[in-house]
UniProtKB/Swiss-Prot annotation:
PANTHER family: D-ALANINE--D-ALANINE LIGASE (PTHR23132), D-ALANINE--D-ALANINE LIGASE A (PTHR23132:SF25)
Protein name: D-alanine--D-alanine ligase A
GO terms, biological process: cell wall organization; peptidoglycan biosynthetic process; regulation of cell shape
Free-text remark on how the cofactor is bound: Binds 2 magnesium or manganese ions per subunit.
Source organism of the structure: Pseudomonas putida (strain ATCC 47054 / DSM 6125 / CFBP 8728 / NCIMB 11950 / KT2440)
Domain ATP-grasp: 138-341
Localization per Swiss-Prot or TrEMBL: Cytoplasm
Pathway as given in its UniProt record: Cell wall biogenesis; peptidoglycan biosynthesis
Listed InterPro entries: ATP-grasp, ATP_grasp_subdomain_1, D-Ala_lig_Van_CS, D_ala_D_ala, Dala_Dala_lig_C, Dala_Dala_lig_N, PreATP-grasp_dom_sf
Binding-site positions, Mg(2+) 2: E308, N310
UniProt: ATP binding residues: 165-220
Length: 352
């Protein structure tokens, strides 16, 4: 593979800042193994872009004393200024966002890259924005014939009794419309719990979703876009053990979590094939690019229900997406290499 100059952008203002740092460390190691030049750009929690070096040691936090980054529209470059070196301009072939949540996964960074003429790994503005909003995602894929979890979207609280009647369940999930990593998500079964959960979710977003609880297995499938077409990974399953009612933040990222991942799943081949086909269908429905992880519930009756779609899935050591593709013949360096290749080739077709 040709050596490219890649700006790896990580951190960000969202509540998933710490997860993004861990994803970036994995991606950085893969890019270095492939022989690319990697310039690291950390976005601190206040939204400042800071140059972290080439390469980066990933100390666990964005260095807030590092120089600020400037981007000029129309120039495929980043620049920063120090007293010792003056202004340093770095030509960039590709932007690789390792960002999760708002101001990174929602189309904002993708729009900035497009305005500046910088090729960018992953989905564009439209697909990123639609997939980030769980309400919009559900409406889009439901219109395409996929089954989704029953839900209501709201900007202010509605009566508990009304929600139970509308959703047909007395156990509900309350979540922000645009957060990830299960941040701000609560499982509730009465009006008091609902009021507290709504307040938590509303701290993350002005739009809050309330969903009916689904009794079923939690299944995930990855999609990777290659020059020859879309590839669905093996299917993985989240194994919830005693102590976790659902796959929350602790279960996802705590090394002592009692929740496990089974990759590949032990599902029958026909069910796996259906999940893979639905993953590709959802990917196309939202006009996504590059890669995504699609999450489902599988009920005892065999119904496959789409839960949500992540356009910048986690790349941590505990993340399902890289595990599923490693079992599909794409270990992290090969997987990241495929993302780089497609990001560059799709940009050339779009004449960025």
């Amino acid at each position: 593979m040709k050596q490219n100059v890649i700006a790896l952008v990580f951190g960000g203002r969202s509540s998933e800042h710490s997860v993004a740092l861990r994803s970036a460390a994995t991606i950085h190691a893969a890019l270095m193994a492939l022989g690319h030049r990697v310039h690291c750009v950390g976005i601190d929690r206040e939204g400042n872009w800071r140059y972290q070096g080439e390469p980066c040691q990933f100390p666990g936090a964005v260095d807030r004393s590092a120089p600020l980054i400037s981007i000029r529209p129309g120039h495929r470059s980043l620049s920063y200024t120090t007293q010792e070196s003056g202004t340093v301009e770095i030509g960039i072939d590709l932007l690789f966002p390792a960002l999760h949540g708002r101001w990174g996964e929602d189309g904002t960074i993708q729009g900035l890259a497009a305005m500046c003429g910088l090729p960018c790994v992953g989905s564009g503005v439209l697909g990123s924005a639609m997939a980030m909003d769980k309400d919009v995602t559900k409406r889009m894929v439901q219109s395409a014939g996929l089954v989704v979890v029953p839900w209501l979207a709201m900007n202010s609280m509605r009566p508990w009794e009304e929600l139970v009647e509308c959703l047909g369940s007395s156990t509900l999930f309350v979540k922000p419309a645009t957060s990830g990593s299960s941040i701000g998500v609560s499982r509730v079964s009465n009006a008091l719990e609902y009021a507290a959960a709504f307040a938590i979710a509303a701290r993350e977003d002005t739009k809050v979703l309330v969903e009916a609880a689904v009794c079923g297995r939690e299944i995930e499938c990855g999609v990777l876009e290659l020059e020859e077409g879309l590839m669905a990974s093996v299917v993985g399953e989240i194994i919830k053990k005693e102590g976790h009612a659902y796959y929350d933040y602790q279960a996802k990222y705590d090394s002592n979590s009692v929740t496990g991942l089974r990759v590949p799943s032990l599902l029958p081949p026909d069910i796996v094939a259906r999940i893979q086909a639905l993953s590709v269908q959802a990917f196309r429905c939202l006009e996504l690019k590059g890669y995504a992880r699609v999450d489902f519930f599988l009920t005892e009756e065999g119904e496959i229900i789409l839960n949500e779609i992540n356009t910048l899935p986690g790349f941590t050591s505990a993340s399902m997406y890289p595990k599923m593709f490693e079992c599909s013949g794409y270990p992290p360096p090969k997987l990241v290499g495929a993302l780089v290749e497609y990001g560059l080739s799709s940009a050339s077709k779009e004449r960025l």
